[in-house]
């Protein structure tokens, strides 16, 4: 009975990671270190280029800068600990460390989702309402969209963490993951977790699904507008405006769905860990590449930043 009511204080967990094979750990360390450094450099350069270039002081780039900053932080929540565990023998993490990691993982993941929805709305306004675009996507409107994204995500995350902190853990403390995700921890708890599971399927799903539905609605309206354009060049220009965003949305939500809307067998759990790597490590690294490949203004700002040349709005 004492074990069943074990206090949460002093508890530590063991992160089992992606593999227990010593022969795979060093190659994985090198791979993920390269991906992480590329993510930091890519997203950091995007933020710096947007700040340094007056030509990029526009709503879509303001939102992109916040997305890149969120991606930079998102990768930093899980990857450093994963890299350390690939080299160290001690894979333990305290309960406080686990909850802290989970808090920022939830918060930054939802921030990404909300910012992608805000960027879809920006694309919608740019294509469907080009004349009043400056009024509809004013500085105040952009600040409100970004502020709402950060506020909603942190309130959502705080709610989860306050509930998770009340759980007791009396079974094995081995977490079959490379970071503290909520589902593995819920399976280790000996408390009644029905209220948290209910929250995940209601509030949690709403926080993730609502931005996704807004993105679908925005792109539905965009598609209808594009089909009405008389010239092929106009349609191509409209598609290129939002092509990079659509690629990022597909990558992000594709992997999220693969992780959180799947069965719970061992094979699916293993695939879930691989998919989690995709949206916590690979997607933040690919986003700057996708946006710079599709956008000449970003390419020009990055070149100017790297060679130390200052560009003005007239250079665009």
Swiss-Prot record:
Disulfide bonds join 98-190. Belongs to the G-protein coupled receptor 1 family. SUPFAM superfamilies: Family A G protein-coupled receptor-like. One of its GO terms (cellular component) is membrane. This is Olfactory receptor 1K1. Residues 51-58, 122-140, 221-237, 294-316 are cytoplasmic. The keyword DNA-binding does not apply. The lineage of its organism: Eukaryota, Metazoa, Chordata, Craniata, Vertebrata. Odorant receptor. Residues 1-26, 81-101, 160-197, 261-273 are extracellular. InterPro entries: GPCR_Rhodpsn, GPCR_Rhodpsn_7TM, Olfact_rcpt. GO terms for biological process: detection of chemical stimulus involved in sensory perception of smell. Glycans are attached at residue 5. GO terms for molecular function: G protein-coupled receptor activity; odorant binding; olfactory receptor activity. The chain crosses the membrane at residues 27-50, 59-80, 102-121, 141-159, 198-220, 238-260, 274-293. It comes from Homo sapiens. PROSITE patterns: G_PROTEIN_RECEP_F1_2. It holds the Pfam family 7tm_4.
């Amino acid at each position: 009975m004492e074990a069943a009511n074990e206090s949460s204080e002093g508890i530590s967990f063991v992160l089992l990671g992606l593999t227990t094979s010593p022969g795979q750990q060093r190659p994985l360390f090198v791979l993920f270190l390269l991906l992480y450094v590329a993510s930091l450099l890519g997203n950091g350069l995007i933020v710096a280029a947007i700040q340094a270039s007056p030509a990029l002081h526009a709503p879509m780039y303001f939102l992109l800068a916040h997305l890149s900053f969120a991606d930079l932080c998102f990768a930093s929540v899980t990857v450093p600990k994963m890299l350390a565990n690939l080299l160290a023998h001690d894979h333990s993490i305290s309960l406080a460390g686990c909850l802290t990691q989970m808090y920022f993982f939830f918060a930054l993941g939802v921030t990404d989702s909300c910012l992608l929805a805000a960027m879809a709305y920006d694309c919608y306004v740019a294509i469907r309402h080009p004349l009043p675009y400056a009024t509809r996507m004013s500085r105040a409107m952009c600040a409100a969209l970004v502020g709402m994204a950060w506020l909603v995500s942190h309130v959502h995350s705080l709610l989860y963490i306050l509930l998770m902190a009340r759980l007791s853990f009396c079974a094995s403390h081995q977490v079959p993951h490379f970071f503290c995700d909520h589902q593995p921890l819920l399976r280790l708890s000996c408390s009644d977790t029905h209220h948290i599971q209910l929250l995940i399927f209601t509030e949690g799903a709403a926080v993730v699904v609502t931005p996704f539905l807004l993105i679908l609605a925005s792109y539905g309206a965009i598609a209808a507008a594009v089909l009405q354009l008389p010239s092929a060049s106009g349609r191509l220009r409209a598609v290129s405006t939002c092509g990079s965003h659509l690629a990022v949305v597909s990558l992000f939500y594709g992997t999220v769905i693969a992780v959180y809307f799947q069965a719970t067998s061992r094979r699916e759990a293993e695939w879930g860990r691989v998919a989690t790597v995709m949206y916590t490590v690979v997607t933040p690294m690919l986003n700057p590449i996708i946006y710079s490949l599709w956008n000449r203004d970003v390419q020009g700002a990055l070149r100017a930043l790297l060679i130390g040349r200052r560009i003005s709005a007239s250079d665009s």
